[in-house]
């Protein structure tokens, strides 16, 4: 608006200068000059009123647009706040549910692991019990036996195995004592017929898991024990007179001492 007013003022000044020049040149027609002065004043007041009206209208439009923009910004902020609140609530709800699900999964895994371990322990225990029952019921005859009778039979088996081992040890020691060649353990004597008992036969005969006897009723133990029984004897080869070693053997070889305690 300021530039337009300046242009108008410049135009008016030019017009006024032209009017004064015309007045000087022409002294005639004094009435026409007075009319032009009145018209110039009217145009100036109209222009000033138009500019005031235009500035007021433009200010009103600017205030209205500013108010509208402020309302839009306020509405956006309120909507964003509400959306942010809703989003935060939803995310918190999802996080809570997810953490709950994770805790349930973890508890379930721990429970499954503990159940698996307990199941394995139960299976191992059951297998042990089945093995024991199988050992007990190897010679099961389907008879009407009580618990005491079964336990008595088991004790008889154990005692019989112990007696058998002692008898075999005693017989082996006496057989070895009778044979003089067994004092020196040479590599060639393992295949000799006079050896009688090999290590394999001794190991098989001493196996406790095989039952090689018949079940007999338990007899009362006697108060006196035979001091010369085979179970109480121990035999050592150190008391046997040494013989000359076989040819080709070293002089540093010493006779071995073998003893079989009565256990």
Swiss-Prot record:
List cystine links.
Answer: none
Q: Where is this region: Disordered?
A: 16-41, 216-263
List where in the cell it is found: Nucleus; Nucleus, Nuclear body
Q: Where is the composition biased (Basic residues)?
A: 25-38
Q: Where is this motif: Nuclear localization signal 1?
A: 21-28
Region spans: Calmodulin-binding = 59-78
Q: What superkingdom does the record give?
A: Eukaryota
| Bias (Polar residues) | 226-241
The entry's keywords: Calmodulin-binding, Nucleus
MF annotations from Gene Ontology:
calmodulin binding
Ranges that cross the membrane: none
The UniProt record lists the IQ domain at 46-75
Any one GO CC term of this protein is:
nuclear body
Motif Nuclear localization signal 2 boundaries: 107-114
| Biological function | May be involved in cooperative interactions with calmodulins or calmodulin-like proteins. Recruits calmodulin proteins to microtubules, thus being a potential scaffold in cellular signaling and trafficking. May associate with nucleic acids and regulate gene expression at the transcriptional or post-transcriptional level.
What protein family is recorded?
Belongs to the IQD family.
Question: How is this protein organized at the quaternary level?
Answer: Binds to multiple calmodulin (CaM) in the presence of Ca(2+) and CaM-like proteins.
Write down what this protein is called: Protein IQ-DOMAIN 9
Q: Which organism is it from?
A: Arabidopsis thaliana (Mouse-ear cress)
> What gene is behind this protein?
IQD9
